[in-house]
């Protein structure tokens, strides 16, 4: 969680700048309605706010590059611990985390570095091709391709880190397998990604439709700091384990399948091991 604090800080700072701009516009609207300010001042304020938004978005995305890039090795460590929990296996939180970071830091850093530049590249390409569509509708094709590439990459991350800490793969094989599984299990993958965004959506609704934006942001930050990040990773790891059991483990000699799942035989074994008279 600590390694994600810079990212959270950048996002919160940008959200506060955007919110303060909305508050100023709302205040100016009330002044215009009461005759305390001219309508021309409100139009200028709206134009300034609209002109500020592209700069604010670009600045935020650029600042997020180093913040996200440093998270990869630590995310690999978390993925190893959470994967063991999802398998119902014991994990020494600190020592296993540290060992997983040491063993997977290169692939983890490369993965997070690519992830960090994705939003900037997507925003620039989407804006550029969006402007070019005024000249030719053919530019919709690369614009849609940008959306598809980013979505597939983000969905592939659900499988990338668990694979990284489970199998010995080069980075190309890691990315290829993740993309194949993300596309092959697209409905569930997208559904789980959207499910992880529900708290963010609820906070956004509270912020937009009530005067309690500060409390919504505080609750959102506390949720992700306390359980949100770990819970979403646990759910993702559980599903990734099931996908690996279907597509990867049957092709590996001696690989166990179904770890972490309930089996009726487990209850029978416990009854057999119980002392007589109990």
Description of each model-found segment:
Residues 1-278:
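Hydrophobic alpha-helical membrane segments
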């Amino acid at each position: 969680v600590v390694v994600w604090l810079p990212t959270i800080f950048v996002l919160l700072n940008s959200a506060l700048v955007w919110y303060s701009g909305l508050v100023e516009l709302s205040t100016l609207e009330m002044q215009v309605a009461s005759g305390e300010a001219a309508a021309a001042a409100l139009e200028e304020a709206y134009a300034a706010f609209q002109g500020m938004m592209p700069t604010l978005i670009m600045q935020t995305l650029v600042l997020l590059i180093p913040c996200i890039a440093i998270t990869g090795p630590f995310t690999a460590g978390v993925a190893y611990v959470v994967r063991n929990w999802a398998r119902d296996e014991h994990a020494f939180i600190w020592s296993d985390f540290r060992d997983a970071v040491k063993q997977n830091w290169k692939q983890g850093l490369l993965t997070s570095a690519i992830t960090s530049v994705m939003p900037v590249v997507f925003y620039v390409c989407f804006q550029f091709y969006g402007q070019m569509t005024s000249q030719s509708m053919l530019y919709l094709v690369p614009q849609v391709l940008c959306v598809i590439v980013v979505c597939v990459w983000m969905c592939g991350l659900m499988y990338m880190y668990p694979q990284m800490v489970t199998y010995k793969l080069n980075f190309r094989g890691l990315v290829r397998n993740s993309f194949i599984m993300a596309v092959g299990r697209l409905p569930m993958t997208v559904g789980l990604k959207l499910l992880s965004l529900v708290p963010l959506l609820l906070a956004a609704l509270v912020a937009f439709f009530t005067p309690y934006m500060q409390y919504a942001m505080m609750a959102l930050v506390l949720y992700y700091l306390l359980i949100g990040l770990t819970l979403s990773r646990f759910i993702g790891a559980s599903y990734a384990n099931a996908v690996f059991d279907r597509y990867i483990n049957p092709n590996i000699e001696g690989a166990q399948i179904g770890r972490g799942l309930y089996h009726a035989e487990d209850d029978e074994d416990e009854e057999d091991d119980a002392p007589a008279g109990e």
